[in-house]
Each structure stands twice: as structure tokens, then as C-alpha cells.
Amino acid sequence: MVARLIAPQFLVLYAFAASVLTIHHRGKVRLPFGRQLTDHSTIMAPYNVLMYLFSAVPNKPVLPVGVVPELAKLRENWQVIRDEALNLFDEGRIKASEGYNDWGFNSFFRSGWKRFYLKWYDDALPSAQRMCPRTVALLESIPCIKGAMFATLAPGGRLVQHRDPFAGSLRYHLGLVTPTHPGECRILVDGIPCSWRDGEDLLFDETYIHYAENTTDQTRIILFCDVERPLRTRAMRAVNRWVSRHIIKESATENEAGERIGVLNKIFGYVYHVRL
């Protein structure tokens, strides 16, 4: 009986269960356990635990931006970035997906959240290169930035509590156009309130439970980036880059017709239409 319980297939199951419990109990704020079991972060739990074990930055919800010093370049050029974001906003180009081809953020569109992709896991979008070349050039000069977009949250918008599924990155926000009462437009990461302000930035671990709200009458516009998580060993950095390049990259989608849509989003669109 004992020999059967320690058979390789059971050891794999035990390791998976332990990683899911680690994710669930990480931080002060938790999803109901039933929801955690069906959350997409559960699928990535074993990989994410490896990322936490080998992380070269503290495993904390909110981090000093200085742990990734290259990001200072964005803050120093925030007005250049803001001007290009405002042009897109005024032209109505920061928008929700026009089809079911943005699996990662699909649920946000019903909550007043919109986006314009700049790059996604190393590839800059042609529309971004054409419409906001200075911002794209800045992003391309910082290799640790894997994905980036302009993101807006409309007056009254609220994103529900969630955790992102991939711990191979950290999340960076740079305030571009923010409400005059910052305490009323904020993000809470594991219960820690943070507000956006023009020209100020924030770095956090998006695999902690977080949500955002804008209770003002003004639209919030930020630069939103996925930053490669610093890791302690060359081997783990290589693994994480492979996963980013060959799996996470397949969640790419378009700003306008003709741009590349990754395999994961093609599958999502097919499944969504079949379900309907």
C-alpha cells in the first residue's frame, strides 16, 4: 500500500497539489478555494512556485521600482510617452477588443478597461510602431520589458479581484493621465492600496490578488508593462525566457486587422464561439 502511494504518478500529483496550496495561501488576501481551483493560475502553479524560489527580488506584493533600475528611463521620459498615449486616446484607438481574441483581458472590457498594445513578449505591433514610435523606441531599448500597452480605466470602472497566472514577470505601471483625487482611483495589491499619479511609477507582483477601481469622473491612462522577473540562476533565466518566447507570446492579439493573433487567443475565440 505504501509503495503504491509513493509511486511516481502519485508523487507528481502531490507536488502539483502542494504548489496549488502554496499559491492559494500566498499573501494576506485569498480567493475562495473553489474559485482558486478553477482559476487559470492553478494550471501555472508548479511553474510559478519555481519562479518564487529562484526570484532575485523579494517575494512581496509591492516592490521598490529601483529593483529594476532600467525602468527609470521610462519615468524620465513620461511626458513623451503621455503625449503619444493622449493622441491615441483622442483618436479612439485605446479600445476594447472587437472580437473574442484577447483571452487574458477579456473579462476586463465589461468593467470600463481598454487597451492599446505596444509590444507583446518581444514583438512590437506594427500599428504601435507607426502611431507611437517614440514610446516603442523607449520600450525596445529596455530588454527586460517583455510586454507593454497603454491602458485606460473609465470613470466608475472597477476590475474584480484576480491574480495573473504567470510569475515569470512583474507588473509595472507608469501614471500618464491620472485623476486629481488619486485616493479615489487606485489599485490594491494583496490589500495594499496604491494610487496612480502623473509621472510616478509602481512595480508589483501581479500573481498576488489585486483589483483596481476608479470612482472619479475622470479617465485614468497608464503605461502598463510586463517586466521579466529577475532570477538568481542562469538556468532559470533561460527556462523563463523559453516559456515567455514560446508560450506566453502566443497570447498576442491585434490592435487592428491583419496583426498577429497568437495560438492561445485563436483557440479562445474558437471555444467562445462554439460555446455561444
Which ranges hold each PLM region?
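A generic "binding-loop/recognition-motif" signal
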Residues: 155, 192, 208
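Short strand-connecting beta-turns/loops that link adjacent beta-strands
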Residues: 181, 217-218
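A short hydrophobic beta-strand segment most commonly corresponding to one strand
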Residues: 171-176, 203, 218-234
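Short acidic-glycine-tyrosine-enriched beta hairpin
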Residues: 190-203
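Short beta-strand His + acidic residue motifs that chelate non-heme Fe in jelly-roll/DSBH
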Residues: 159-162, 204, 210-216
